[in-house]
């Protein structure tokens, strides 16, 4: 029988990819735990929206966040074993998504209050989680320098999620 529990974390430590162990309340664990939360919230967004284009974008972002999370969950040895990392291509893809969505949704005329419909509200929850991730990466970078691409991707991600929420809010069938 395959077990998902190992009992190795019962004393408050967890293993990084590469073999080293750190405390479960370490900022690195907080950061990749936030990535995990965000991936799950994006699953809620995916299940909530009826827009095929947004669903495709959400799925792609989830896959990319797994790559980002793997890098955060790796020690120096593990980093050398990663097959994929976040790069300029992923950042550019988010920028194109943002530009396309903002052109489609039109200019902002006032502050956006989340809740116009369930899909946009869920995207705004994901946006705030991505902002938390960005804050954690900024703090983590001071003690454990991160690659610039990770910080840039997390910065663009919250804007991408905002732009996706705007698409949901401007749909003809959006609630008033």
What does each of the following model-derived ranges do?
Residues 1-176:
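Phosphate/pyrophosphate-binding loop motifs in nucleotide- or prenyl diphosphate-using proteins
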């Amino acid at each position: 029988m395959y077990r998902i529990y190992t009992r190795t974390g019962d004393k408050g430590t967890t293993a990084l990819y590469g073999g080293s162990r750190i405390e479960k309340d370490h900022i690195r664990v907080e950061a990749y735990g936030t990535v995990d939360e965000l991936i799950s919230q994006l699953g809620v967004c995916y299940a909530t929206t009826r827009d095929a284009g947004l669903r495709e974008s959400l799925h792609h972002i989830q896959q990319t966040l797994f790559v980002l999370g793997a890098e955060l969950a790796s020690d120096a040895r593990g980093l050398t074993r990663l097959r994929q990392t976040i790069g300029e291509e992923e950042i550019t893809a988010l920028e194109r998504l943002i530009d396309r969505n903002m052109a489609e949704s039109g200019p902002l005329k006032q502050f956006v209050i989340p809740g116009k419909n369930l899909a946009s509200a869920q995207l705004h929850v994901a946006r705030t989680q991505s902002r938390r991730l960005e804050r954690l990466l900024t703090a983590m970078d001071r003690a454990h320098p991160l690659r610039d691409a990770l910080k840039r991707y997390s910065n663009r991600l919250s804007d991408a999620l905002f732009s996706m929420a705007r698409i949901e809010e401007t749909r003809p069938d959006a609630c008033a």
